[in-house]
């Protein structure tokens, strides 16, 4: 029995060649695994893409808002938010919005001291709502407000469809008719007038000028005090008399004075208050806003549709589940950002071509 076994081993060992391994071509695919590090495999499916910059687009299945009022020609978003004459129109509903003006400005109406308040934020505040509408009624009777009666001031730089002069529809420039004298602080209540449980955004402000103009308009050339309060937020201002900075953002408007504009957010059923002296810009029409719209920084125009809006790349279609490149805010059905490309191995672990053993 032992002799037979020895014979078999000899026969086997005298075979011409013995092959080890699996025959395979060279593999260019390398994947990094959790347990074995880098491994060559016979096939992979790429899971990542590196996007290129493109136009922004409407998110598929929904409307995306670019300009607040697309049909308001030659109007900035701040013009629309303040309801400048000729810039009043319908703001479309939208689930997503493009923040395309980094520093919103107004023009061709009245020089605004933008940096005294948070007024630049108003267009972006509105953009964050899905539904936005301007009230059809004024929130208070400005002509009969405390300290009046008032006439409502206008500017030749703000023509409207019926007159060569006008003013923002969201505010009334309260100029005393007869009683042009200094006044102690006066208080007006601002009721909630929206009808569908929306947030009410109430715009107000004040006008100031040089000493001569302040005396002529209001009978008082001293700095005036103003306070607004709503939803637990109180803001105080003191007006500046003369010495105003140049208003290059407003295109060199001719007025000697300046206005400071602010807003307050009133929740359903809540009353706001404004305490004021001379030169007040009393609230008139208010914004009624509801729902949420996702906001992303981008640019116009909006072209076509896309699965995803990306702050750096624009409109993206989700061809792969992951992407590499610049990481930035994105909204919609977006791929997930990863630092390095990901691959799914769909073949076997690569083994080099079979090696020949030495003949015995």
Curated annotation (Swiss-Prot):
InterPro entries: Capsid_hemagglutn, Hemagglutn_HA1_a/b_dom_sf, Hemagglutn_influenz_A/B
Principal cellular location given in the protein's record: virion
Pfam family, one: Hemagglutinin
Glycosylated residues, chain numbering: 40, 74, 160, 179, 210, 246, 317, 346
Entry annotated with the keyword Disulfide bond: yes
Gene Ontology terms for molecular function: host cell surface receptor binding
Assembly notes: Homotrimer of disulfide-linked HA1-HA2.
More about this protein: Major glycoprotein, comprises over 80% of the envelope proteins present in virus particle.
Name recorded for this polypeptide: Hemagglutinin
Native source species: Influenza B virus (strain B/Texas/4/1990)
Taxonomic classification: Viruses, Riboviria, Orthornavirae, Negarnaviricota, Polyploviricotina
């Amino acid at each position: 029995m032992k002799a037979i076994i020895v014979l078999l081993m000899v026969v086997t060992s005298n075979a011409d060649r013995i092959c080890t391994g699996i025959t395979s071509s060279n593999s260019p695919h390398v994947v990094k695994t959790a347990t074995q590090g880098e491994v060559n495999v016979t096939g992979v499916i790429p899971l990542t893409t590196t996007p290129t910059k493109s136009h922004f687009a409407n998110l598929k299945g929904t409307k995306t808002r670019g300009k607040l009022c697309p049909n308001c020609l030659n109007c900035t978003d701040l013009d629309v938010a303040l309801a400048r004459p000729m810039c009043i129109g319908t703001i479309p509903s939208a689930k997503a919005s493009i923040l395309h003006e980094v520093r919103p400005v107004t023009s061709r109406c009245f020089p605004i001291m933008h940096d005294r308040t948070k007024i630049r934020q108003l267009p972006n505040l509105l953009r964050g709502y899905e539904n936005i509408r301007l009230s059809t009624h004024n929130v208070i009777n400005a002509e009969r407000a405390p300290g009046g009666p008032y006439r409502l001031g206008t500017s030749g730089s703000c023509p409207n469809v019926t007159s060569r002069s006008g003013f923002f529809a969201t505010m009334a420039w309260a100029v005393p008719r007869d009683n042009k004298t200094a006044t102690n602080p006066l208080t007006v209540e601002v009721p909630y007038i929206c009808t569908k449980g929306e947030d009410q955004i109430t715009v107000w402000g004040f006008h100031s000028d040089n000493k001569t103009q302040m005396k002529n308009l209001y009978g008082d050339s001293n700095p005036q005090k103003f306070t607004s309060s709503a939803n637990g937020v109180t803001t105080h201002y003191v007006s500046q008399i003369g010495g105003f900075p140049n208003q290059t953002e407003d295109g060199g408007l001719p007025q000697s004075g300046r206005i400071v504009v602010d807003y307050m957010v009133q929740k359903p059923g809540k009353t706001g208050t404004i305490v004021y002296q001379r030169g007040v810009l009393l609230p008139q029409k208010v914004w009624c806003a509801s729902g949420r719209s996702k906001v992303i920084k981008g640019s116009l125009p909006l072209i076509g549709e896309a699965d995803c809006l990306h702050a750096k790349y624009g409109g993206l279609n989700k061809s792969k589940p992951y992407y590499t490149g610049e990481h930035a805010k994105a909204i919609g059905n977006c791929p997930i950002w990863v630092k390095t490309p990901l691959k799914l191995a769909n073949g076997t672990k690569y083994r080099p071509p079979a090696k020949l053993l030495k003949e015995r």
